[in-house]
Amino acid sequence: MKNTTAMADYELRHIEALRKNLAGCTVLLKKDGNFPLEKPCALAAYGSGVRRTIRGGTGSGEVNSRYSVTIEEGLQQAGFTLTGMEWHTGYEQARKKAHKAFLKQLKKDAKAVNQNFILYGMGKAMPEPEYNLPLNAEGDAAIYVVSRISGEGNDRTPLKGDIRLTDSEVRDILALDKKFTRFMLVLNVGGVVDLTPVMGVRNILLLSQLGVETGGALADILLGKANPSGKLTTTWAAFEEYPEMPDFEDMNETRYREGIYVGYRYFDTFRKQALFPFGYGLSYTEFRLGAVAVEANGAQITVRTSVENIGALAGRQVVQVYLSKPAGKLDAPWQELCAFAKTRELAPGETESVTCSFTLPEMAAYDTETASYILEAGNYIVRVGVSSVETAPAAVLHLDKTVTTLQANNVLGSTDFTDLTAPAATMERPAGVPVIEIDPAAIACETVAYDRIEEVLPEVDALTKEDAALLLIGDFDPNAKGFASMIGTAGRHVCGAAGESCDKISGFPFLIMADGPAGLRLAKEYYEDDKGKHAVGSTAMPASLQEMLSGPMKLVMSLMGGSGKPKPGCEIKTQYCTAIPIGTALAQSFDLAFVEQCGDIVGEEMERFGVHLWLAPALNIHRSIRCGRNFEYYSEDPLVSGKMAAAMTRGVQAHKGCGTTIKHYAANNKEYNRTRNNSIVSERAMREIYLKGFGICVREAQPKAVMTSYNLLNGTHTAESRGLIMDILRAEFGYEGIVMTDWVSPITGDARSAHRDSQAQYVAAAGGDLFMPGNKGDYDNLLQGIDSGAVTLEQVKINASRVVRMARALTQE
């Protein structure tokens, strides 16, 4: 609950900036004209999300903010009289019983596979329970709020209570829609839920998970103070309609057999039926697109149109431009998003001119046979509209011969299968649209210098082998074991931080890192004594972890994390951070300016609390709706993902001494056994889908750091892949920052795995700069690698020089 009298000025400013933009992150999926409401009224409020509102997912995505407004609180603050509150008393009883059984089974399952209960249960969400409670409340309108949560460490399931609705939910939603003239189904979810059984409901709002003001945002929308203007960045469909992924649950190998046909690329090309397609979203008002003009200036394509608000309420619209490419040597999806733009808020009757642009080389396909990006000869159809299924052809770009846009190298290994390919089809040239000839000579072929030489700083060159190696390992306590080894020396200088680089060498600055991606996660309260900084109680511990622990275990974990009870008279200091919307919700806004503003909020709080690197944003692709961390990620589309990550990075890095860490590079699209699972992906799919967003972010915003993923790629750990790090990231994308690992620890892997964890010596040899969080074993491994020749001392010092340069740049030393 909000208590503004206790809040600092920065908190109030940040919350105000967020609140007025949150409706832009929500997606109105269905409407019948009965919303918005004219004024606050008696509202029958049902569903777990009314009182147990989810503001974001679990794991690294959790944020320790001062408060969070539930939907119940937000509606009451807005003046609604809520009815049906006795339903929630009954629901809590059913949930408590189910949760007790859930934890009991979780402990049993962990024991059966000889795993630590806490690590085994990380990210596992209890399915919604079944219940049988009366719906006897009256009111002028009604809502039912479906909530789902997921998180780091585990994936979702296609079961009732998770991806599917429970029988209880379906029964009550349909009953309420029948009983009330004004009924809204509200989805307080971070990922796709199969809505097949309730598609007859007249009003559906994807509220998503919007951070601290989630409840207030819904009140604004119901009352028409704010108008939903988001668009889906992931295709919503019945679970059976998505591509089959038979080895998604395989412990060791995950084969990306669908190739480039991910999300709408699959649905459009293979004529699959979506419930709600990519790019889709309604508004309380109506819009009309004007005439479309397409121009070509060499390889630069510019699309101009206008948007008119022809409805009765103010609102915003998103113009989307898609490109259908010719299928020749390479097959091609039916269409791919190539540009988008969002209008300002338009009053009824108001019109705005909109311009979108892209370059043809940005849309090139990767030919593995020639190791090059190519644009094949033929017709390129430009489609313009307001969703992936609501477009019209606007122009045909004709290229009379195939051109190469970039000559690369195949560096990612091979697969043991052939990618899914599109059925042979001839795309007819649409009638009545202009044909624009593209001069092949105007499309330059980019060359890449893969053998660039990097200098070693003289002061680093003068270091001993032992000291140079220290700079590549996250700061560690040589005596730490178990959980303590997993978190390194996190929080020594900033309480609740996720990790630090080495501070053991005089004259060399160090970096402080904090988790995200929905804001900074730091200890809310801490105190200092002669032994350092300590979190008060469990204020540094994620709420999802606290829920799983008994009282004694909470105490043990708090003490291990440096938490404790301050002595009388000790000053208690605070680090309240703002929880911004989850990544998927931000992307649904299609509002780059707002995403950059969110980055500005995070950057200001980083400056305030002394954090150099934010371990975010995360821009992995929504390959499967089962991925437990999809809420952190932006989209199934790499253009959206890259643009959003770049906007967030610009906002953060506008602040002195602050940088982002884009992650997880790459092909980290499931959580089960993530540290030792091998993603088997074709070079083409990697480059066109899973790496493309990273390239966009690097070229547009140059994040200070990149975090590799836990998984292997075609048999090699991503953190140990020189092709990924040096050839593609640095040489092709032009990356200038540092590369770190994800938080590797031997206690997080499943002992039954066929693959090992990544190792510091091989990470360094691949050009990785920081092995995180760091422990004595990692340091010894690196020294052994130097002695054995697995990594040269010169490479270690090159990597160390990059770390030192970045630390100096961010600490201003």
Where do the model's predicted regions map?
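Short beta-strand elements
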Residues: 390-407
